[in-house]
């Protein structure tokens, strides 16, 4: 698959937009390149957006600009139809109706669960409203009975639920989550990412979720924005991004796909590991290029005359990952069920 220009599928927004970014750019004074460059996207009310990319790609900087923690260089940020940042407009963070969940929980150690959740309500509600909203938020994240505990008496997963409840309590229009699961162990992460999606969906609150974990982004979001070096490489549904990557970077980063040199012969693409037939809607004019083959699409069979050698095999529980070497020395990876057990 040759490098392709960034493809932005036209997403039909039937619900009002809760977040709109138009040509947003940010460059720090000490840097020669932009941290965020010309990013435009729209998030519909009630949807969850994952900002996905490697470290340093600009996703956290973009999140901080949406929150109001970083000024932008150029472009426009609008929340619920209201411009909150542009060349002539600056709305401070506390007036943006945005909740924030941080990677390190950011709880007050001297306050109880109830007091932490209620903290952001002190200036916007009376005592009766504070009590009602605090109880509602604690119930939303299923922490009833732990109201009087301190953060030091909670597990990591429980602390992150408190942080989420605190963000939910003021009933913001949008919640921003900056890699909220990265400090948790695997089982807690899997459970909590399901709960975060369920809580936000049931509350009808939109969310922007920053992560460098591909599986996490695909599982939790309605839209995925893949970023590289400050630019938006692709915006689409998880299925679109996975099955129709817009560039080689997206294919490599999101699916860990193999790329195999290929030459066209009629309707077939010939490679050193076999021939591939592409469906008509994926035909291209070029006579040669790199063919993208996902790890799960490589089918393995034992063949004593084959030129592909199994170099190693990793057991991953539900599947095997085979490390392969071709005659030319290229390294490939294939994933199979454990029912396929090659030597």
Residue ranges of predicted features:
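Helix-to-loop junction immediately C-terminal to a conserved catalytic motif
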Residues: 67
């Amino acid at each position: 698959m040759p490098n392709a220009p960034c493809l932005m599928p036209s997403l039909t927004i039937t619900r009002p937009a809760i977040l709109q970014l138009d040509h947003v750019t940010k460059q720090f004074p000490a840097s020669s390149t932009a941290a965020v460059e010309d990013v435009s996207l729209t998030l519909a009310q009630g949807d969850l957006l994952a900002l996905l990319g490697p470290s340093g790609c600009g996703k956290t900087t973009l999140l901080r600009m949406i929150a109001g923690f970083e000024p932008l260089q150029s472009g426009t940020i609008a929340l619920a139809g209201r411009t909150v940042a542009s060349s002539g407009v600056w709305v401070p963070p506390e007036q943006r109706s945005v909740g924030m969940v941080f990677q390190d929980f950011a709880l007050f150690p001297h306050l109880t669960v109830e007091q932490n959740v209620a903290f952001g309500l002190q200036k916007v509600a009376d005592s009766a409203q504070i009590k009602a909203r605090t109880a509602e938020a604690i119930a939303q994240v299923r922490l009833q009975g732990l109201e009087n505990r301190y953060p030091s008496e909670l597990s990591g997963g429980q602390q992150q639920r408190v942080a989420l409840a605190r963000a939910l309590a003021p009933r913001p229009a949008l919640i921003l989550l900056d890699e909220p699961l990265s400090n948790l162990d695997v089982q807690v992460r899997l459970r909590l990412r399901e709960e975060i999606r369920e809580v936000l969906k049931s509350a009808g609150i939109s969310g922007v979720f920053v992560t460098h974990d591909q599986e996490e982004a695909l599982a939790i979001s309605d839209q995925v924005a893949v970023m590289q070096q400050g630019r938006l490489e692709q915006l689409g549904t998880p299925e679109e991004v996975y099955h129709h990557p817009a560039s080689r970077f997206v294919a490599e980063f999101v699916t860990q796909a193999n790329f195999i040199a290929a030459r066209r012969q009629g309707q077939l693409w010939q490679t050193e590991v076999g021939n591939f037939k592409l469906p008509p809607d994926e035909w291209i004019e070029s006579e040669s290029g790199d063919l993208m083959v996902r790890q799960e699409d490589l089918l393995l069979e034992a063949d004593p005359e084959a030129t592909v050698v199994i170099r190693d095999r990793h057991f991953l529980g539900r599947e095997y990952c085979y490390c392969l070497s071709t005659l030319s020395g290229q390294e490939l990876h294939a994933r199979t069920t454990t029912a396929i057990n090659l030597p």
